[in-house]
């Protein structure tokens, strides 16, 4: 896999009617691991399994990328949304790598964590409390769409996928016409 990070800039656009006028956040999503790795198999007829992949290298890479991005853009706080209370190993690794990068390289930035369920509730209650969200692949996909809904829909939020040597820019998700 080429290394890839996704960033979505979520803010209120002029001329787009929304419930919220105070949204200004960035979503940083790890884009190659997690359940979207495509590692699935049929254990026995009628029973299938999907494997969630998390590597220390991938988790540290996206953590560094997110903190460097936040620092360069003069953002103040990174919030990691996770489910480490249930997925202790995979989400635990993601969370621990982000905390390690914060403590060792970017102590000047604020750092908080939230369980994904509670984080989504907080997002719809008051999105202004967030600045940069750092998420693993599946959570980032879902939360990007949720946040697009806060500011007018999928077609109004720009997204970028950054690889080692190339980048792709697009709307956060496809839209149905």
Residue ranges and their predicted role:
Residues 16-21, 43, 71-72, 103-105, ...:
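Solvent-exposed alpha-helices and their adjacent loops that cap or buttress functional pockets
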Residues 8-49, 138:
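N-terminal glycine-rich phosphate/adenylate-binding segment common to multiple enzyme folds
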Residues 123-177:
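Glycine-rich phosphate/nucleotide-binding loop
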Residues 47-114:
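Glycine-rich phosphate/diphosphate-binding loop of Rossmann-like nucleotide-binding domains
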